[in-house]
From Swiss-Prot:
PROSITE patterns reported for this sequence: AA_TRNA_LIGASE_I, S4
GO BP annotations, alphabetical order: tRNA aminoacylation; tyrosyl-tRNA aminoacylation
UniProt KW keywords: Aminoacyl-tRNA synthetase, ATP-binding, Cytoplasm, Ligase, Nucleotide-binding, Protein biosynthesis, RNA-binding
Listed name of the protein: Tyrosine--tRNA ligase 1
Cited SMART domains: S4 (SM00363)
Residues at which ATP binds: K235
NCBIfam families: tyrS
Disulfide bonds: none
Amino acid sequence: MTNLLEDLSFRGLIQQMTDEEGLNKQLNEEKIRLYSGFDPTADSLHIGHLLPILTLRRFQLAGHHPIALVGGATGLIGDPSGKKAERTLNTADIVSEWSQKIKNQLSRFLDFEAAENPAVIANNFDWIGKMNVIDFLRDVGKNFGINYMLAKDTVSSRIESGISYTEFSYMILQSYDFLNLYRDKNCKLQIGGSDQWGNITAGLELIRKSEEEGAKAFGLTIPLVTKADGTKFGKTEGGAIWLDKEKTSPYEFYQFWINTDDRDVVKYLKYFTFLSKEEIEAYAEKTETAPEKREAQKRLAEEVTSLVHGREALEQAINISQALFSGNIKELSAQDVKVGFKDVPSMEVDSTQELSLVDVLVQSKLSPSKRQAREDIQNGAVYINGERQTEINYTLSGEDRIENQFTVLRRGKKKYFLVTYK
């Protein structure tokens, strides 16, 4: 079996680590427990969380014991890492509800039923929530010097703009998580994004001060995902790309990966898939020699969409994509149309109402006037469910409805409009 750290290194998944030689020795000598934390700052995880989740999975596939820590307590405080301003605090009820949703999402990626090394979900509210202020200050806070904390990037980057004591203390709480998991579950490794390096090393320092001499614990950070064009990864014009299919449909999710820049696609295959080194190198060569085929992008989109949403959702996403590309809309189901044309302008009409094509083109603003609508039809620029219609006096009929629910109109190559029937 390929050495785990060598594989992570090939994939570019190691930003920094403490005591590489010691960690490598530990991983080869025993199957260790490791963790990564996920604060419930929304009701769903997004693709920015995929890298640490999939890194936990890589460790599990190598026989180690992953712990996914939901920040039921730290989510009430707010992590200042990477933030220019103070977070808005959410209520305990909301954080609790979001914690449960995130717990459910994590179960898609980690095997909690594995016979030898089942993954574990923990919630730091279970131990932080029980602490009183006196115990916290005496047992934990006394181990942290102010100068030590101010030197950490997560804090120093906020000194100018201001940071509350609440967020200032986040580092201490995360450090206590590591100490608690070290004591309670013999957890020896914390992994996180590169912006977590200061918090992770603070946790190692707390373990060193609190435990007997010779206590072994390690930290490893993974890179923050970047894009070659300089825009923020995981964001589109429509907002964040979520792992919850109700917030980002599998089709939109699939399209996000399909549209990956040639300059990024090989890196993302390494980051987000479990393809072998040989397979990835083959796709790198295909991207170099025949980028127009976009084979690497297709494989990336298939692998990640299947992983997050399952094979059935992937097949639906592919069907919608192919239908839109070929123009063969009538082959889609009503559900496919609903998903694929979610953001297209639409109007609802009575199912008994007769609609002339010219009137619909004007009402939908696909054509600015009846005269222009007639010209568009005559010139072959108007399509009903992907099929060209050249009859000026055409009236939409039941045959033009997909499952009696939708008619998709198109003018030119890209201007779509959706008619829905009630």
